[in-house]
Amino acid sequence: MDIFKELILKHTDENVLISPVSILSTLSILNHGAAGSTAEQLSKYIENMNENTPDDKKDDNNDMDVDIPYCATLATANKIYGSDSIEFHASFLQKIKDDFQTVNFNNANQTKELINEWVKTMTNGKINSLLTSPLSINTRMIVISAVHFKAMWKYPFSKHLTYTDKFYISKNIVTSVDMMVGTENDLQYVHINELFGGFSIIDIPYEGNSSMVIILPDDIEGIYNIEKNITDEKFKKWCGMLSTKSIDLYMPKFKVEMTEPYNLVPILENLGLTNIFGYYADFSKMCNETITVEKFLHTTFIDVNEEYTEVSAVTGVFMTNFSMVYRMKVYINHPFIYMIKDNTGHTLFIGKYCYPQ
């Protein structure tokens, strides 16, 4: 939640989407090669990110690999591209096993194309490229984690009921969206009143063991107060208050595709991961050469329609030399926060939807 909160502060009126699973997986790979204070910071941060995962679902190596049986439509993959000019330690290579490949970073264009092709393949063609800028001549290693999720709704929306409706970007700005309609579905729902405002939470299940949770403020511009006040603990408490209601749900079809990846370096530094960047970085368990994290890139894609939700995310790290009851009607027609989660306790994706793209 903390990375998401930092991002939405920087992107106030923009659509935001991240995959905590992808980010954590990348940090875990870095931790395999970290030593000293760098390892201490990474281990502590990974432990904090992993706090809300049930003990029996945690990985002994702190890798956030989501169990396929628990979320059958989720695919995760990691890849480490290391310079063929560096001799990496055998102990590090043993930990990352088949996910490592040597490349020639001096042949920058060929290596860039190779990496982007892997990203495209792992995300089922939904993210065509992670690397949009030329590679630095100082690049020594790139760590990438890709997540692709596609799930059918348990209660599909009827296509013939989809219609054009208003979506309020703010009180003064209105646009139109394709509004999907789901009728007479038994969904988990709660309305919460907090000091900072009222809002509804609705849990919309997919086939299998995953769902999309939407937090919809009562006020058209109420999302800003939720952004400021939401925490993992509060969200867990609110979800514990959900109960089954018969609901007619009106929800926009939406698609979010990023034009440029986020560079998470400043955010991770703000959150205490200062010793993986710059002079104090210690990745001596990877190799004898002094290397540090130069960029921490993260990009995502989501497509929500009547039949399914499809989401992809990629995180990349560049190392260089120095997410019978009466029927209610719920209209999702203004900015909201959404999460996709599985029943293992993992938040696969978390986002904010402000306007149609």
Curated annotation (Swiss-Prot):
GO terms for molecular function: serine-type endopeptidase inhibitor activity. PROSITE patterns: SERPIN (PS00284). One of its GO terms (cellular component) is host cell cytoplasm. Pfam families: Serpin (PF00079). Gene3D superfamilies: Alpha-1-antitrypsin, domain 1, Antithrombin, subunit I, domain 2. Keywords: Host cytoplasm. It comes from the Viruses. It is found in: Host cytoplasm. Plays a role in mediating viral host range. May act to inhibit a caspase independent form of apoptosis to allow efficient virus replication in infected cells. Belongs to the serpin family. Poxviruses subfamily. This is Serine proteinase inhibitor 1. It comes from Monkeypox virus. The lineage of its organism: Viruses, Varidnaviria, Bamfordvirae, Nucleocytoviricota, Pokkesviricetes. The gene is OPG208.
